[in-house]
């Protein structure tokens, strides 16, 4: 239908007759001459419909409105002096139209294309219109480049691409499964995979050495700005490798992906233990674009005359007292603002938030009366305080303190505007605990139960570490993986520590345990969140921006109105009956 894309044309094409197709981006009538900015997937070009050149084309142009689909035939010419548009790639040329066809009109638009002030639910309802915006068009072109770069990079390193089943069985991987009822086997269900974890391990047992796929995964979990019920990951597994091999491979691939997206990143990435990350930054995915760090001061507070502080400080294993220094904070935040910060941390379980201000004559603040001068001097020394600095303190249970002080660190950085939005700061977090304790006292695997432990014979479960690795970018977990358990006895021992008895092991994981007894090789891998990667590359505020047809935060699709009710006939075929939700008394 067309001879060129809009932005294929340049001054070198002046005088050529061309045929273009696209949408009417804008329409203007200047003194009887109609100007139309024609838009296609490549960009914009200006069409000129002058009755002096073609009355027929001009008559058609008079009927054109926003988003009409057009086919235009005409000659390329240079724009007149002073009429060029440096903002457009084709800003030095235009097309004098000799023939114009309206291929399809458009109803009046529910919103202007590219207007991001429109409610997101409305934009998602008309996602096919929203996707016409230049910003989203560029995002999905970038996403395609990233996928191609990932495939090319892994292909160069000898990986084989596979497709693993989407209809599988439920396995405990940390979130709720999406279940699919079987018509053939009434009362039985498939589960949509939370990841291809077990299948990729089985492929290593099959001798394929290097596996990858760009996999669709499903998790029925509460949604946030960076989560969706269905998502895509670059899934990778390798045989006969150690952790260092996986890290080197992942850095090579990420370097290739980011280069394809216009970013040169430096390797190797910085590395940090889980303990250092949580104790220093209050997070296992710290944002290192700014240098606010937490400092341990529990031993100093143990000597405090304040009984609350001193009692907290006595149990150094279960409790924490952390200082967070803000350079020049006394000149940035008013006393009223600093008092208001307490409201922020209380939302995350804090009992309070103390602070000192570093003045010319030493530390000042309501907490000073509880300390000897020598202890105040030690706080100044340990926190390396200078005049004008403020240091905040959080005290209480370890898990709660590290969490709210980590959140407070991010909050302060945002308030001070010290986050460099153009900086890409990668980090490997290593030496994760193998297990984490739940609120009911039971234990679950921090990553998943197929991760190889470093020291399985430690008597205290909380002291067992895993050979796991997360790659972090700007405070987001970009991906994670581990060396896997390849020996049946170790896998069974991990299951037992998690409270999974032999009968349940056989029922849920019998196929894996069997595979491990037939010469399973040492293996490991990683999965990179492809949606999240694209969110960060494109500086998008939500993962929904980088998914063509995303769900809302309520896990609904305004476009297709999914989820929807099944018909009675469908339910009968599946042997299902919907029970009314019981009302609470």
UniProtKB/Swiss-Prot annotation:
Reaction catalysis annotation: tRNA(Asx) + L-aspartate + ATP = L-aspartyl-tRNA(Asx) + AMP + diphosphate
Site (Important for tRNA non-discrimination): 30, 82
GO cellular component entries: cytoplasm
Entry's EC annotation: 6.1.1.23
Gene Ontology MF terms: aspartate-tRNA ligase activity; aspartate-tRNA(Asn) ligase activity; ATP binding; nucleic acid binding
UniProt keyword Aminoacyl-tRNA synthetase, yes or no: yes
Pfam families, per the entry: GAD, tRNA-synt_2, tRNA_anti-codon
Location relative to the cell: Cytoplasm
Enzyme class, spelled out: ligase
Major location (coarse): cytoplasm
GO biological process, alphabetically ordered: aspartyl-tRNA aminoacylation
Binding-site positions, L-aspartate: 173, 219, 447, 484
NCBIfam families: aspS_bact, PRK00476.1
Self-association state and partner proteins as the record states: Homodimer.
Function: Aspartyl-tRNA synthetase with relaxed tRNA specificity since it is able to aspartylate not only its cognate tRNA(Asp) but also tRNA(Asn). Reaction proceeds in two steps: L-aspartate is first activated by ATP to form Asp-AMP and then transferred to the acceptor end of tRNA(Asp/Asn).
Protein name: Aspartate--tRNA(Asp/Asn) ligase
Organism from which the protein derives: Campylobacter concisus (strain 13826)
């Amino acid at each position: 239908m067309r001879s060129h894309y809009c932005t294929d044309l340049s001054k070198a094409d002046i005088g050529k007759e061309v045929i273009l197709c696209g949408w009417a981006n804008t329409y203007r009538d200047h003194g009887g001459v109609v100007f139309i900015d024609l838009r296609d997937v490549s960009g914009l070009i200006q069409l000129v419909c002058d009755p002096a050149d073609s009355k027929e084309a001009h008559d058609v142009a008079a009927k054109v409105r926003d988003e009409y689909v057009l086919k235009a035939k005409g000659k390329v010419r240079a724009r007149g002096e002073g009429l060029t548009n440096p903002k457009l790639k084709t800003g030095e040329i235009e097309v004098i139209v000799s023939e114009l066809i309206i291929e399809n009109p458009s109803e009046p638009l529910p919103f202007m294309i590219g207007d991001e002030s429109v409610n997101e639910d409305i934009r998602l309802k008309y996602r096919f219109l929203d996707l016409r915006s230049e910003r989203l068009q560029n995002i999905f072109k970038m996403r395609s480049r990233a996928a191609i770069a990932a495939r090319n990079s892994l292909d160069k390193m000898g990986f084989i691409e596979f497709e693993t089943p989407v209809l599988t069985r439920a396995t405990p991987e940390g979130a709720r499964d999406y279940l699919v009822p079987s018509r053939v086997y009434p009362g039985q269900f498939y589960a949509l995979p939370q990841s291809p974890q077990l299948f990729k391990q089985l492929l290593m047992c099959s001798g394929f050495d290097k596996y990858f796929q760009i996999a669709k995964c499903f998790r029925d979990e509460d949604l946030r700005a960076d989560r969706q019920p269905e998502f895509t990951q670059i899934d990778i597994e390798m045989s006969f490798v150690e952790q260092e091999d996986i890290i080197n491979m992942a850095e090579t691939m990420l370097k290739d992906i980011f280069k394809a997206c216009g970013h040169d990143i430096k390797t190797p990435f910085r590395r940090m233990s889980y303990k250092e990350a949580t104790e220093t930054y209050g997070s296992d995915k710290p944002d290192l674009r700014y240098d606010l760090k937490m400092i341990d001061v529990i031993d100093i507070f143990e000597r405090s005359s304040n009984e609350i502080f001193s009692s907290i400080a006595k149990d150094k294993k279960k409790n924490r007292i952390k200082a967070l220094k803000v350079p020049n904070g006394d000149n940035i935040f008013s006393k009223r603002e600093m008092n208001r910060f307490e409201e922020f941390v209380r939302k995350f379980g804090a009992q309070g938030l103390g602070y000192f201000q570093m003045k010319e004559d030493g530390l000042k603040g309501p907490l000073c009366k509880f300390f000897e001068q020598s202890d105040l001097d030690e706080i100044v020394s340990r926190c390396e305080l200078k005049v004008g600095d403020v240091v905040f303190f959080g005290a209480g249970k370890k898990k709660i303190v590290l969490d709210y002080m980590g959140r407070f660190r991010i909050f302060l950085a945002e308030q001070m505007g010290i986050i460099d939005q153009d900086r890409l700061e990668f980090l490997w977090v290593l030496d994760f605990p193998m297990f984490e304790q739940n609120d009911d006292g039971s234990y679950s695997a921090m990553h998943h139960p197929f991760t190889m432990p470093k020291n399985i014979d430690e008597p205290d479960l909380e002291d067992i570490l895993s050979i796991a690795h997360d790659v972090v970018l700007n405070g987001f977990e970009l991906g994670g993986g581990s060396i896997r358990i390849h020996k049946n006895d170790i896998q069974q021992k991990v299951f037992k520590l998690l409270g999974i008895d032999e009968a349940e092991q056989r029922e849920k994981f019998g196929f894996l345990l069997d595979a491990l007894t037939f010469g399973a090789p040492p293996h490991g891998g990683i999965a990179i969140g492809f949606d999240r990667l694209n969110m960060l590359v494109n500086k998008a505020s939500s993962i929904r921006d980088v998914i063509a047809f995303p769900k809302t935060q309520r896990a609904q699709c305004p476009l297709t109105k999914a989820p929807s009710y099944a018909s009675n006939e469908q339910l009968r075929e599946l042997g299902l009956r919907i029970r009314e939700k019981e009302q609470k008394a």
